[in-house]
From Swiss-Prot:
The keyword Nucleus applies. It is found in: Nucleus. GO terms for cellular component: nuclear body; nucleoplasm; nucleus; plasma membrane. The gene is RAPGEF5. GO terms for molecular function: GTP-dependent protein binding; guanyl-nucleotide exchange factor activity. One of its GO terms (biological process) is Ras protein signal transduction. Keywords: Guanine-nucleotide releasing factor, Nucleus. This is Rap guanine nucleotide exchange factor 5. It comes from Homo sapiens (Human).
């Protein structure tokens, strides 16, 4: 068989009641207990059947032998696209099998072809005079409409990425001109023409105003950590976009500030001053590279343009201690900052954690998981939002440990642990499994779990509650406890993203992407099916559930104070509870 062949599972082809739909020759019903293959060569003339295993006896029910799911197993990119176009219906709603195949293809096509390749292939299918030399003239507009339907679905899925791709913009203009030329010969294309006029209109508005800064799936935040090469972003950064800015207070601790890219130093300093409870006029910001060079930021300096280096950090320092590299020591005064949390309502605090996590989770494009999995670098220009949610999970874990270990008084520390157990329970109740896992892992951090004096004073009912919460994080049986509990939760809900990525990675590493020079589309279907978990979780929207009077609480959650050094955390742990 040639390299252009396509291999598919088609359980419907062998049903007795659909025999008339087959070719002229009768094919016997195979007695297979697993789905079987149909090979389609380039001319689509010969059929060859095979199976991975055979059953010794034939089941009485055809339905019990054959899956209802229609699955493309493998093929060249061109043949997969051709098969997809053949199967598309022009009705408003596709059948389930075709809809799944279309969604699988659109979610994963970048694995085996570039966007430019896809655009060129679609143009060829649209402009072909005759399809494989056997198309009736009456079928031409139908084929064109199928191509346009696929394009519209592609645009709907990638509406926030396509305007940044030059190949896509050129393709949309070209196919629009083709439809404009064809509509006189085929008036039935008028509906598609109007749709493309709307699409091109939206793209023009995107060029002018980048849509709304609040639009879904746009990169709402960008990592701004000098420790990790500062800024990671997708496409051109605009002044309306926001960043995660780490402002270091000591060598191992920082305040995480959410601010616009266009923010000046004075605006960021105001947030930091409020967080660390110092007078703004007594503080200043300085950019310090790892080579030791310092650059003091003036009030009106743009933070990014003035301090964007390959490596380094932004520090806040007291003006009266300008010559000190780390002007804020972890002294008794800094330790007392942890006491603020004891006065906060645990449900409201969990609610703010959920709001923040949802803003990140709701901004993740489904294909970010594909890029993250297939890119050896892990995070890049197409995974900004996903990387930020993963970073947030890590920060919440560090925040829990930081708050507990900065509390030197045993009684207060016991209250803090109880507080975090309650917050974790509320996160579970609010269906925010990302922060739930992070808090439980923070309480189980070695530097916290070793605090025997603290844990001994935790009341029995809290220990029991924490044990129940811990059981959901049990990794045994492939995280069965978590999966069962999460499956029962109704959307909207936030999954534990590292585990979802683990699932996609497991499929990727356990299956070859190409088999005999053909795209292993069965693997891509499994990946797409897992990625669709995001879509299910976002079936409904949380919205902003924060009362206006929670602004202080919201500011606290948005700008967490964390110590990011495990060594520093262990030193604090041994300081408050020395080894006996």
């Amino acid at each position: 068989m040639g390299s252009s062949r396509l291999r598919v599972f088609d359980p419907h082809l062998e049903r007795k009641d659909s025999a008339a739909a087959l070719s002229d020759r009768e094919l016997p019903l195979p007695t297979f207990d697993v789905p079987y293959f149909k090979y389609i060569d380039e001319e689509d003339e010969d059929d060859e059947w095979s199976s991975r295993s055979q059953s010794s006896t034939e089941d009485d029910s055809v339905d019990s032998l054959l899956s209802d799911r229609y699955v493309v197993v493998s093929g060249t990119p061109e043949k997969i696209l051709e098969h997809l176009l053949n199967d598309l219906h022009l009705e408003e709603v596709q059948d389930k099998e075709t809809e799944t195949l279309l969604d699988d293809f659109l979610l994963t096509y970048t694995v085996f072809m570039t966007t430019d390749d896809l655009c060129q292939a679609l143009l060829r299918h649209y402009s072909a005079k005759k399809y494989q030399g056997k198309e009736e003239n009456s079928d031409v507009p139908r084929r064109k409409r199928k191509v346009l339907h696929l394009v519209s679905q592609w645009i709907a899925l990638y509406k926030d990425w396509l305007p940044e791709d030059e190949h896509s913009k050129m393709f949309l203009k070209t196919i629009y001109r083709n439809v404009l030329d064809d509509v006189y010969e085929y008036p039935i294309l008028e509906k598609e023409l109007k749709e493309f006029q709307k699409i091109l209109g939206m793209h023009r508005r995107h060029t002018v105003d980048e849509y709304s800064p609040q639009k879904k799936n746009k990169a709402l935040f960008h990592q701004f950590s000098l420790k990790e090469n500062w800024l990671q972003h997708r496409g051109t950064v605009t002044e309306t976009e926001e960043i995660f800015c780490h402002v270091y207070i000591t060598e191992h601790s920082y305040v995480s500030v959410k601010a616009k890219v266009s923010s000046i130093a004075q605006e960021i300093l105001k947030v930091v001053a409020e967080k660390i409870q110092y007078a703004e006029e007594d503080l200043a910001l300085v950019a310090i590279t790892f080579s030791g060079e310092k650059h003091e930021l003036q009030p009106n300096d743009l933070v990014i343009s003035k301090s964007l280096e390959a490596s380094g950090r932004i520090y806040v320092y007291r003006k009266d201690l300008a010559d000190t590299l780390n002007p804020f020591a972890e002294n008794e005064e800094s330790q007392q900052r942890s006491m603020r949390i004891l006065g906060m309502n645990t449900w409201d605090l969990a609610l703010e954690l959920m709001n923040f996590d949802w803003s990140l989770f709701n901004s993740i494009h489904e294909q970010e998981l594909i890029y993250f999995t297939f890119s050896r670098q892990g995070s890049g220009e197409h995974t900004a939002n996903l990387s930020l949610l993963l970073q947030r999970c890590n920060e919440v874990q560090l925040w829990v440990a930081t708050e507990i270990l900065l509390c030197s008084q045993l009684g207060k520390r016991v209250q803090l642990v109880k507080k975090f157990i309650k917050i974790a329970a509320h996160c579970k109740a609010q269906r925010n499994l990302n922060s739930f896992f992070a808090i439980v892992m923070g309480l189980n951090t070695a530097s916290v779990s070793r605090l025997s004096q603290t844990w001994e004073k935790i009341p029995g009912k809290f220990k029991k509650l924490f044990s129940e919460l811990e059981s959901l994080t049990d990794p045994s049986l492939n995280h069965k406890a978590y999966r069962d509990a999460f499956k029962k939760m109704k959307p909207p809900k936030i999954p534990f993203m590292p585990l979802l990525l683990k699932d996609v990675t497991f499929i990727h590493e356990g299956n070859k992407t190409f088999l005999d020079n053909l795209v292993n589309f069965e693997k891509l279907h499994m990946i797409a099916d897992t990625v669709r978990t995001l879509r299910h979780c976002r079936t409904n929207q949380f919205g902003d559930l924060s009362p206006k009077e929670h602004q202080e609480l919201k500011s606290y959650v948005n700008h967490l104070y964390v110590i990011d050094s495990q060594q520093a955390l262990f030193e604090l742990s041994h300081r408050i509870e020395p080894r006996v």
